[in-house]
Amino acid sequence: MFSPRTDVSRPITDRVKESLFSVLYKYDLPDGKIVADLFCGVGSLGLEALSRGAEFVTFVEKDPKTVAILEKNIEKAGFASESKVIRADAFKIGAAVDEQKYDLIFVDPPYSTTRETKEGSPLSELLVLLSEQSAVDGIIVVRTERRTELLSRYSCLETIERRQWGTMAVTILQRSSK
């Protein structure tokens, strides 16, 4: 996989990625599901989902240089027809593509934007938006620093699980039908 020549990115290790997808399997994900990968960088999580049987992945990344690398990675992996790349700020659009509802959404913003989680914060506003863009029972996976604690609920999203690996944490939220 191609990656940017910068120290700004926070690539997820293969061990953590394997552990995360083991957790997702118990929710019958990602096989056959519609997925979004927000703040995707070079596409590691979305490409992993495709390699594990996801039907389609929408990648959202705002940095033009990173998008160019992402597109190379998608092409190299052979998933061009099963994916779409949107160059935009995910805080502004979420995962929006028409009226698509997503079964699984990865949210991996810069840690500096996730330190504030209370109502009205950028992360909170994004999660409320994603609650409208996810399918009923859809899963949203949010990567943050280990010390960041998300609220137990954002709109109709409820925190159902939290895992920690090293200095990072992953919080899994699920959309209820309410």
What residue spans do the PLM features occupy?
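Class I S-adenosyl-L-methionine-dependent methyltransferase catalytic core
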Residues: M1-K178
